[in-house]
Curated annotation (Swiss-Prot):
Active site (UniProt): 146 (proton acceptor)
Spans annotated as Disordered: 429-453, 665-690
Protein name according to UniProt: Probable serine/threonine-protein kinase PknB
Molecular function GO terms recorded: ATP binding; protein serine kinase activity; protein serine/threonine kinase activity
Reaction it catalyzes: L-seryl-[protein] + ATP = O-phospho-L-seryl-[protein] + ADP + H(+); L-threonyl-[protein] + ATP = O-phospho-L-threonyl-[protein] + ADP + H(+)
Organism: Bifidobacterium longum (strain NCC 2705)
Enzyme class per UniProt: transferase
Length: 690
């Protein structure tokens, strides 16, 4: 029975586009979220699996696992749901889907398939992104359980994105197998030994898989290959991978140690956390000695085998079939399967079959021991023969035919001197260019074979010289979180200053990135240390507010500040423009804080006093001065002068300090007589009159 694929989901919100990916459980389409106007990726479960409770549980688990995580190196999940569709028979069927972040780029698997082994610097940057994602998910209590190149996306901007948490499990549920039948709990080439044995997994299982990914990036191939999933799983449990430097001539041996520690058979010998793994890589790439330098993979393997033998020798109490589910690796599908518990007759039959399998396994083990003993004896004989062969000088070469490669590769020795020293030892130099190095151009970075190795006289020694730090543009990480910005910058090949600086910002939220130094877009050598600036959550009162119009300021800073508007007159600022602010310009306030602005109403206005005709001039002048106006006489101003008229007229609104013109005339003086005697006398007379 088949079901036609819908063209839209969630009531038309998600308009489905072309198919961009297909897996064993689901298809992925590019889609348009019409509500938010953004491009998304929609993973739709295959209709034939939607009615399988096991697969449905896995699908829902992915949505739940990732929805609670928010990390720049993990593909975000935006939404999930189930769409009801009609099958060809007309029956209604559910079609579960997950709406995810759309990442435009390539999977790491495709990149390796096309380009082969990656450069050391690219390996470093990809691993930093993967380990950032794992560090975050582990701290959230989630184990991925299927880390592999196919689940790692590299965006067009170089950002690493880990995806497909479909078999992820919470740490407290990590002992459970994923399904009751045909449930994949990891991909064979990246499977940890404990997963291969069906044991409880923890976050170190993810780190083992990450170590396998690092190995494949360095060499272009997985650490173990075979004709079947069983053969590969067996190697993960019991064999040590070929060192990367043996597969890639010239690759520094320190990568052997880092990969070996990450891929330790005994999880107790692995990196304890993703952060510890990441620190070791950064330490080495920055010229230090990583913790992995002291790791011995052969000791790890022998100790692991001894511990497992001891565990098998411990007395055990048989467990009834209904008490513990049987876990088995299916050699046909390459998958681990959980066989459902049985009861009654079924339980007896199951127990009988289990006893038969145990007897067969015991016989097989005895056979392996015998074969192993024979092989060991043969190897011992060959080793002895080889030693005798060498001691008898069967190669017919004297010690004079071999030379020890001198230590010539260091920052202080020039290319010409290195060549001369090698030639003086009877060796030739083959010059190679190291484009991954951040050392100055011409600096010797490595040799192959290494210094101290014995080689035939006349052999060529490969010597790599730095091509100089390659320049690239600083990515724009403005308005991103510190963690996301750091990941993007490191993925672009830069170092990031551990000390983060803060600065005020009017519009960028607290703790989000405001800028970098060097600035975004600037072309600088890879390996340059970038300093990140983040918002303090405070902002500065703008310095250019005074003199601007009220409307333009309110529009320009809308959402950034809360304004209170007051009015006042001003002799110097035009009406409608801002005269002053509080707090003062340059003051630091919280984002969205209050600023009071005063807006000019223009010069102060006063009313011309009610000066009537006949008022003496002196009185009129005093009345004008009392309200801040000046008097300008148009006529006599003596003590007898009287007002004829004023301009502007009484009651007029004029600018404070302006002049009022008073038209005056001389007043009349009245006659009078009087008599007096000596110094005394009396008299009367008329006053002034019109």
């Amino acid at each position: 029975m088949s079901t036609s694929m819908p063209t839209a989901l969630a009531g038309g919100r998600y308009q489905l586009g072309q198919l961009i990916g297909r897996g064993g459980m689901a298809e992925v389409h590019v889609a348009l979220d019409t509500r938010l106007g953004r491009t998304v990726a929609v993973k739709i479960m295959r209709a034939d699996l939607a009615n399988d409770d096991i697969f449905l549980a896995r699908f829902r688990r992915e949505a739940h696992a990732v929805a609670q995580m928010n990390n720049p190196n993990i593909v975000n999940i935006y939404d999930s749901g189930e769409e009801l569709v009609s099958s060809e028979s007309g029956d209604a069927e559910r079609l579960p889907y997950i709406v995810m972040e759309y990442v435009k780029g390539q999977t790491l698997r495709d990149i390796i398939k096309v380009n082969g082994a990656l450069s050391q610097r690219d390996c470093e940057q990809v691993m930093l992104g993967v380990l950032n994602a794992l560090d975050y998910s582990h701290r959230m209590g989630i184990i991925h359980r299927d880390i592999k190149p196919g689940n790692i996306m590299i965006s067009e901007q170089g950002v690493v994105k880990v995806m497909d948490f479909g078999i992820a499990r919470a740490l407290d549920d990590s002992a459970a197998t994923m399904t009751q039948s045909q449930g994949v709990v990891g991909t064979a080439q990246y499977l940890s030994p404990e997963q291969a044995r069906g044991e409880t997994v923890d976050m170190r299982s993810d780190l083992y898989s990450a170590g396998c990914v690092l190995y494949e990036m360095l060499t272009g191939r997985p650490p173990f290959t075979g004709d079947s999933a069983v053969a590969i799983a067996y190697q993960h449990v019991s064999e040590v991978a070929t060192p990367p430097s043996a597969a890639v001539p010239g690759l520094p041996k320190m990568w052997d140690s880092i990969c070996a520690k990450a891929m330790a058979k005994d999880r107790q010998n692995r990196y304890a956390t993703a952060s510890e793994f990441k620190t070791d890589i950064l330490t080495y790439m920055n010229g230090g000695v990583p913790v992995a330098a002291a790791f011995n993979p052969l000791t790890d393997l022998s100790n692991m085998k001894a511990r497992k033998e001891a565990e098998r020798d411990l007395p055990t109490t048989p467990v009834e079939p209904h008490q513990q589910p049987t876990q088995a690796f299916n050699p046909v599908t390459g998958q681990f399967e959980q066989i459902p518990p049985a009861n009654g007759a079924n339980a007896a039959a199951l127990q009988s079959r289990a006893q038969q399998r145990a007897a067969a396994a015991k016989a097989k083990k005895r056979k392996k021991i015998i074969i192993g003993s024979v092989i060991a004896a043969i190897v011992a004989v060959l080793v002895i023969v080889g030693i005798v062969f060498a001691m008898n000088g069967s190669g017919n070469k004297s010690s004079e035919d071999t030379v020890t490669i001198p230590e010539v590769c260091n920052a202080s020795t020039s290319k010409d001197n290195i060549k001369l020293k090698l030639e003086a030892s009877g060796l030739k130099m083959t010059e190679k260019q190291d484009t991954d190095s951040t050392e100055p151009e011409g600096t010797c970075t490595k040799m192959s074979p290494d210094a101290g190795s014995k080689v035939a006289k006349g052999s060529a020694v490969k010597v790599w010289f730095s091509a100089g730090p390659q320049s690239t543009q600083v990515p724009d990480v403005k308005e991103r979180s510190q963690e996301e910005a750091r990941s993007i910058l490191e993925s672009a090949g830069f170092k990031v200053n551990a000390a983060v600086k803060t600065e005020d910002s009017a519009d960028i939220a607290k703790d989000m990135v405001t800028k970098t130094d060097p600035a975004a877009g600037q072309s600088v050598p890879k390996g340059t240390t970038i300093t990140i600036y983040v918002s303090s959550g405070m902002t500065t009162v703008p310095s250019n507010l005074v003199g601007q119009s009220k409307d333009s300021v309110l529009q320009q800073y809308e959402g950034k500040f809360s304004f209170t508007v007051e009015q006042e007159s001003s002799d110097t600022v035009e009406a409608g423009l801002i005269t002053r602010v509080s707090p003062d310009s340059g003051s630091s306030i919280a984002q969205g804080g209050f600023i009071t602005i005063w807006v000019s109403t223009g010069k102060e206005k006063v009313a011309v006093p009610n000066i009537t005709a006949g008022t003496d001039y002196v009185t009129a002048e005093l009345m004008l001065k009392a309200v801040g106006l000046k008097a300008q006489a148009n006529g006599p101003t003596g003590s007898t002068a009287v007002v004829v008229s004023i301009n502007p007229g009484a009651g007029s609104q004029v600018d404070a300090g302006s002049t009022v013109t008073i038209t005056t005339k001389a007043g009349s003086t009245g006659g009078g007589t009087g008599t007096g005697d000596g110094g005394n006398g009396t008299g009367n007379g008329g006053g002034t009159g019109e």
